[in-house]
Design a protein with these regions (language model features):
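Short acidic, Gly/Pro-enriched loop/turn segments at secondary-structure junctions
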Residues: 162-171
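Internal glycine-rich, Lys/Arg-flanked active-site/core loops of soluble domains
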Residues: 16-101
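Short structural boundary motif marking the start of a folded domain
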Residues: 2-6
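Short proline/glycine-enriched turn/loop segments at secondary-structure junctions
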Residues: 141-150
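Single conserved hydrophobic/aromatic residue that forms the stacking wall/gate
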Residues: 175-183
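Glycine-centered tight beta-turn/hairpin loop motif at sheet-sheet or coil-to-beta transitions
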Residues: 11-13
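Active-site scaffold segments
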Residues: 54, 91-95, 104-137
Length: 183
């Protein structure tokens, strides 16, 4: 079975592709695939960009506090779920608030390796094409709150599931919106 591949088409025409790993974080992948299929990410921005660390997006409000109206269980070691995907450059992971089960739609893509996130955030995929685009976004000028001065807009986000079925995610009570300080 082929893993799902997500294509991020940026407003400027740049393309990033990421392979998702359902064997590592099955419900997280179900959630991401579901949101992509609904067009949730289309038109959203990378609202938080830290060169040498990561780029974060997926907030419908573009502020760092928005989400899809629900949260999912955090699939990472500190939350009792085995997840051995380390936060190397290009890895996709879910942003969350302090509560381990507070991730919803916000995600981040690693610009550089960050071992302090391993086991504490739900890594679920990796950029397979377009790491140069991640680098370009990560190196864009930002304001005092790490917000890009020039909007980094995901024009269209699509997923190829190769005929595999990815069910709707299991959701939790809605915890506080993700606004992590270290991821």
């Amino acid at each position: 079975m082929a893993n799902p591949v997500v294509t991020f088409e940026m407003e400027n025409g740049d393309i990033m592709k990421a392979e998702l790993y359902p064997e590592v974080a099955p419900n997280t992948v179900n959630n991401f695939v579901s949101l992509v299929k609904k067009g949730f990410y289309d038109g959203l921005i990378f609202h938080r960009v830290i060169s040498g660390f990561m780029i974060q997006g997926g907030d419908p409000e573009g502020t760092g506090i928005g989400g899809p109206g629900y949260s999912i269980k955090g699939e990472f070691a500190q939350n009792g779920v085995a997840n051995n995907l380390v936060h190397d450059a290009g890895v996709l992971s879910m942003a969350r608030a302090m509560h381990p089960d507070s991730a919803g739609s916000q995600f981040f893509i690693m610009h550089k390796k960050a071992p302090h996130l391993d086991g504490a955030y739900a890594a679920f995929g990796k950029i397979t094409e377009g790491m140069d685009v991640v680098n370009k976004i990560a190196e864009t000028a930002t304001d005092y709150s790490d917000r890009p001065l020039e909007k980094q807009i995901m024009k269209k986000v699509t997923v190829e599931t190769f005929g595999e079925d990815y069910p709707e995610p299991e959701t939790c009570l809605l915890y506080t919106s993700p606004s992590p300080r270290d991821a």
